[in-house]
Curated annotation (Swiss-Prot):
One Gene Ontology term from the biological process aspect of the record: carnitine metabolic process
Subunit text: Homotrimer.
Keyword rRNA processing: no
Membrane-traversing stretches: 8-28, 51-71, 92-112, 143-163, 195-215, 231-251, 263-283, 315-335, 347-367, 403-423, 446-466, 475-495
Pathway: Amine and polyamine metabolism; carnitine metabolism
Membrane topology, as annotated: Multi-pass membrane protein
InterPro entries, A to Z: BCCT_CS (IPR018093), BCCT_transptr (IPR000060), BCCT_transptr_CaiT (IPR023449)
UniProt record similarity statement: Belongs to the BCCT transporter (TC 2.A.15) family. CaiT subfamily.
Protein name (record): L-carnitine/gamma-butyrobetaine antiporter
């Protein structure tokens, strides 16, 4: 083995502890599913009710930081000495594909039902005001605010990697300017990295927990094969195999091709919904929802509902902000990797504009379609959920479109590829973060990437065995708590170091 290859091997102190911790959590969960569900409910209630305000302030402050980067002294600073590695179109496609999975199709199709049936601000369920604010809240949760937080951290990691030429891509490695090299190389740095890795593994497991039932329900619809946990496991195994094939071709070929195919197919499917799902209504509903969003945004930003205690901000806003927090470092590391050579302003504006457009299109088309099906009494969503579960209800919203078989084939392929691209990005970052060192332009070991994707698949199966959305939401909330503090430290470390090395 060459010296370089040896150097790129795994780092035991950040590779084995997460494996052990996650293994213990899996064992305890499988050992008693009922007791695990009780713990899950208690954790979710405590974090969202006691600490929900912190997640809301975090998102607001990071959004303000995005404006500082775009219009401040660092706006024209370039992240690296070379030209951009990818074309602008492929760059945006890769960002969108890596940051979203079939979970986007999951929430995009059913989220509006929850918002209009149990709306915020004391509104009556299924009323006109509830329907008006339904899509507006989706645009809020999946709009410029969270993407801006990703772009800020992406700039931070790109700065440390391409400007400061750091070889190790782990959260702790960026904290030297803030806490000193002694603490980074000691117990403090190890704890930070292990928190990050455990949380990320849980987050990836939740994404699989959302995506897998959609695919298996598609299979049941198309082929008549019953949806079972065994079928879920087979689907997850197929994803892991495809991930291995993609990474074998390297980042440039494998991820780029998968991302491009997925993005073009997304446009095709959304175009189909737009054409046959009522184009006039969808455009009008989106336009009205943007106005509603602008009108209610100050309230949405700080809504904790301590008086009414309806639970809406805890169940949705805090949950989603924790979702964004838990994925922030992992996604930002990957986004920084593919943004070499771009300016700070280009990265921030490209990410927020491109990714907001993508998520808004998905939520507008799929959510608008679901609302029409409810209004026209074509589907009884509550009955479908009670009898068959949420995934079946989502499938029925797409199957209700004309040419249902062709539509379901497209939806099936899109869900499948979408999750492959997410696993690609996550396994790449996990492998990179558990290596001893990564030189600029190097790729993490293939077997390590595949190994991480296998572990994440196991987590997904366990969450599916628990059943329901609450275990998935709680895994996100619990993992988001420690990373909340890690994200803040990375941000402060970047600001402190940039003042010294990025002078005007």
């Amino acid at each position: 083995m060459s010296k370089d290859n040896k150097k790129a091997g795994i780092e035991p102190k950040v590779f084995f502890p997460p494996l052990i911790i996650v293994g213990i959590l899996c064992w305890l969960t499988v050992r008693d599913l009922d007791a695990s569900n009780e713990v899950i409910n208690a954790v979710f209630s405590y974090v969202t009710n006691v600490w929900g305000w912190a997640f809301e302030w975090y998102m607001v402050i990071m959004f303000g930081g995005w404006f500082w980067l775009v219009f401040g002294r660092y706006a024209k600073k370039r992240l690296g000495d070379e030209k951009p590695e990818f074309s602008t179109a492929s760059w945006i496609f890769m960002m969108f594909a890596s940051c979203t999975s079939a979970a986007v199709l999951f929430w995009g199709s059913i989220e509006i039902y929850y918002y209009i049936s149990s709306p915020p601000f004391g509104m009556e369920g299924y009323s006109a005001p509830a329907k008006e604010i339904g899509l507006a809240y989706s645009l809020f949760h999946w709009g410029p605010l969270p993407w801006a937080t990703y772009s800020f951290l992406s700039v931070a990691f790109a700065y440390f990697f391409f400007v400061r030429k750091m070889e190790v891509i782990r959260p702790s490695s960026t904290l030297t300017p803030l806490v000193g090299e002694k603490h980074v190389n000691g117990l403090f740095g190890t704890v930070v990295d292990n928190f990050y890795l455990v949380a990320l593994i849980l987050a990836m497991g939740t994404s699989l927990g959302l995506a897998t039932p959609l695919v298996t329900e598609c299979i049941q619809y198309l082929f008549g094969i019953p949806h079972t946990l065994q079928l879920d496991a087979i689907i997850i195994s197929c994803w892991i195999l495809l991930n291995a094939i993609c990474v074998a071709f390297g980042l440039q070929k494998g991820v780029k091709i998968a991302s491009d195919v997925r993005t073009y197919l997304s446009f095709l499917m959304l175009g189909w919904v737009f054409i046959v799902g009522g184009a006039s209504f969808i455009v009008n509903y989106f336009t009205d929802s943007v106005g509603t969003l602008l009108m209610y945004m100050p309230r949405m930003l700080f809504y904790t509902d301590p008086i009414g205690k309806g639970g809406f901000p805890q169940a949705w806003t805090v949950f989603y902000w924790a979702w964004w927090v838990i994925y922030a470092i992992q996604m930002s590391i990957f986004l920084a990797r593919i943004s070499k050579g771009r300016t700070v302003r280009e990265l921030c504006l490209g990410m927020v504009s491109g990714l907001t457009a993508g998520t808004w299109l998905i939520w507008t088309y799929s959510g608008g379609n679901t609302l029409q099906l409810i209004d026209q009494n074509i589907l009884n969503i509550p009955q479908l959920i009670d009898q068959y579960g949420v995934p079946r209800a989502i499938i029925e919203t797409w199957a209700a479109l004309p040419l249902s078989t062709a539509t379901m084939w497209g939806f099936f392929i899109l869900c499948f590829i979408a999750t492959v691209t997410l696993i690609n990005a996550c396994s790449y970052t996990l492998a990179m973060s558990t290596c001893r060192s990564m030189k600029e332009g190097a790729e993490p070991p293939l077997l390590v990437r595949i190994g991480w994707s296998v572990l994440v698949g196991i987590i997904g199966i366990i969450l599916l065995a628990l059943g329901g959305l609450k275990p998935i939401q709680t895994a996100i909330i619990a993992g988001g708590c420690p990373l909340f503090f890690v994200n803040i430290m990375v941000t402060l470390s970047f600001i402190k170091d940039a003042k010294v090395h990025w002078k005007d």
